Amino acid sequence: MSGTLVLVRHGQSEWNLKNLFTGWRDPDLTELGVEEAKAGGAALAEYGIKFDIAFTSVLVRAQRTCQMVLDAVGQSSLETICDQALNERDYGDLSGLNKDDARAKWGEEQVHIWRRSYDVPPPGGESLRDTGARVWPYYLTEILPRVLAGEKVLVAAHGNSLRSLVMVLDRLTKEQVLNLNLATGVPMVYKLKADSTVASKEVLGDMSAAH
């Protein structure tokens, strides 16, 4: 019997709003981010799911999103595991910089490569491949066994840590994942087969609103 895996990207953060590279820095949600998280929770409540466990990162924007989703589905006290393996991609020396200022310092082409290549990290930071190298093993050892045991599992995390998971779940190429944008607060509901491949996927919201 296979279970259900729900992935949710955190709501808009204060640094998303200011156009800053965030990474492992820890800004809170904006008012819009709170509304996005609540809307994602409301969509899951309407869907009718009840979770067995939740996973999130050690960063407050993901943790608050996770809690708001659980509040919305009536499971405020559900066991939640926080682990830095699910943290956002580490942007290294870019962390805290305005994206326009970074382009002025390093050049638009170089910053674009750091942001959108699969395996070229910014100085002192991680590439998307590096991010996946910590996210995927954690998924395989801690999350997937619960789903395969029939549990309903919530993962509230970040744009790039979730892209690393979606890349494998949806069987995307390196080129395809670079063009993948995940909207804040929009749940993705995966039903998995016994062999851990995807049986079905539903998006509960407008993924075209990604930023």
Curated annotation (Swiss-Prot):
The keyword Transport does not apply. It catalyses: (2R)-2-phosphoglycerate = (2R)-3-phosphoglycerate. Its EC number is 5.4.2.11. GO terms for biological process: gluconeogenesis; glycolytic process. It is an enzyme of class 5 (isomerase). One of its GO terms (molecular function) is phosphoglycerate mutase activity. The record marks 158 as: Transition state stabilizer. Keywords: Gluconeogenesis, Glycolysis, Isomerase. InterPro entries: His_Pase_superF_clade-1, His_PPase_superfam, PG/BPGM_mutase_AS, Phosphogly_mut1. This is 2,3-bisphosphoglycerate-dependent phosphoglycerate mutase. It comes from the Bacteria. It comes from Sinorhizobium fredii (strain NBRC 101917 / NGR234). Substrate binds at residues 9-16, 22-23, 61, 88-91, 99, 115-116, 159-160. Pathway: Carbohydrate degradation; glycolysis; pyruvate from D-glyceraldehyde 3-phosphate: step 3/5. The active site is at residues 10, 88. Homodimer. Catalyzes the interconversion of 2-phosphoglycerate and 3-phosphoglycerate. Belongs to the phosphoglycerate mutase family. BPG-dependent PGAM subfamily. Gene3D superfamilies: Phosphoglycerate mutase-like.
